[in-house]
Each structure stands twice: as structure tokens, then as C-alpha cells.
Amino acid sequence: MSAEVISAPLTPVEKWLDGAALSSIYSSSYWNDIEEEKSKEWWIADGSTAAFARLEAYLERSGLMQSYRIAEKFLAGLAERDLLVADLAAGIGWTACLLSKLPNVSSVHAVDISEHRLEQLFPQAIRMFDGVAGKLKRSLGSFYDLRIADASVDVVFIAAAFHHAANPLRLLSEIDRVLSPGGHLILAAENVVSVAAVVRRMIRKLLHERKLCTNFYELFPPDDILGDHYYRVSDYYFFSQLLGYEVLNFVVTRPQTATVILRKSVS
């Protein structure tokens, strides 16, 4: 990586979507609600030390950073150099910034549907995490419709966002399109519903509704507001089989949080 690239300034946000197209995306109004965002731990727009400390504490407390470190250790150990990474639903860009610091990563393309996160918070995240601005690219767009060439990305990284996909199979199909043969899909800090959680909800439903329910999707329906899905370990393995990907690592870091690393077939 040349010194010119490393020292290059952050380029403007590339806008794949106009206002009308953005507003048509399910849940985009929630992710673009600035007033709502101001109450969140990741609101670091003022660039203050207090804001950074609050975000850092949240990332540690929530297990997000622990999950990210598992993914980072894996990526840092890859023999491949000049990796091209797509960070989907990148949010404020904390993962993209950390990924940009890895010596074997040449660029990180951060995609999100939240304009203020990309425009206002992302530059502050670069400061906070010492991100390499010259390696970073930001695009306002949907992860269902990536303006990225076929088989051109070495790593697709998604942190705590895969479950937000109202149509997970459509998202996986788009990921498979842009991921190069032998490339890796990393799902960090994703929800994984334990057997104990299923049993507890079955008992609760039995007690309150006098109904014995064994249907997982009835016990854990998608969230009404965001469309969030809930997944079991078996669901992630089903997704991998559907894609024909190999499961390289599946680490449950907390009772309901997992890091999943998949590899696409080379053929």
C-alpha cells in the first residue's frame, strides 16, 4: 500500500439512492431519524472525549467489540494481501475504520442506508479509531442492490446487522454475487437464539395463552418495526448449505450472540 493512498483524504459519500428511493426502503425512516439517534450510545457527532468514551464502553459492554476481535484475528491471519472488503450496514463506520488498519486490507467499502451516519458520524469514527481514510469508501445504498462488480470482493463483513434484513435470502444472493471465489463472509455479533430461550418462550406462551407452541417462527416472529429476524445455530448452517459455503468458525461469545465465518467455494 503506497504512502499516497494511506495519507489520502476521505472521499465524499457516493450516493446510490436519492431521497425517494431511500424512503422506499423498509425501516429506512428509523435509521435516518437523527433525533432518535441522538439518544444512542454511538452518537459521536460532537467528537468529544465523553462521546468517544461512551461509545467505547457500549461496544465492550454489548459484546460487539469482542465479536469484532474474533473476526479481526481471523482476517489478520489470512495469507492473502491487498484484501478488498465490503462492510455492509456499516453504520457509523467503527468496524470499517478498524478493518482499514489491518496491513493486509487495501480498501474497505462501507455501505449503509443512514445518511447522517455516513456523513456526520463516520468522520468522527475515523478520528476515534485511527482509521486509514485513504482506504475507506462510503456509499449510501441498500445492501440488497450493491453497485459493486461481480466476484470483486474478497471479504464481506456484516456486524450486528444481518438480522435486520427483512429478506435474508435476497441479501445472501447479493453477497454471493459480489464475493470472489474463495472469499469470506463474516457475520459478527449476530443473534443466535439458544435452546433455553426457546423453552422459556414456550413455557411463557403456555402459561399466558394456554397454548403449546413448538413453531420457532411463531415463538420468535420478526420485529414489527425493523423486521428483525431471530436465528438459531441451525439456521446459519442452513444458510451456508444454501450458498454452498464452508463454515470455518462459529463462536458463541455470549448466550445470544455469535460470530460466523464462512468461505465461498473456489469453483
Language-model-derived ranges and their functions:
Residues 1-53:
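N-terminal, positively charged/glycine-rich alpha-helical extensions of SAM-dependent methyltransferases
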Residues 48-67:
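Class I SAM-dependent methyltransferase Rossmann-like catalytic core
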Residues 61-81:
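Conserved alpha-helix/loop element of class I SAM-dependent methyltransferases that forms part
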Residues 92-145:
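Class I SAM-dependent methyltransferase SAM/SAH-binding core
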Residues 182-190:
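Conserved beta-strand signature within the Rossmann-like core of class I S-adenosyl-L-methionine
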Residues 169-181:
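A short glycine-rich, Lys/Arg-flanked "PGG" loop and its adjoining helix->strand segment in the class I
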Residues 191-243, 249-252:
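C-terminal alpha-helical "lid/dimerization" subdomain adjacent to the S-adenosyl-L-methionine
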Residues 157:
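A conserved beta-strand element that flanks and buttresses the S-adenosyl-L-methionine
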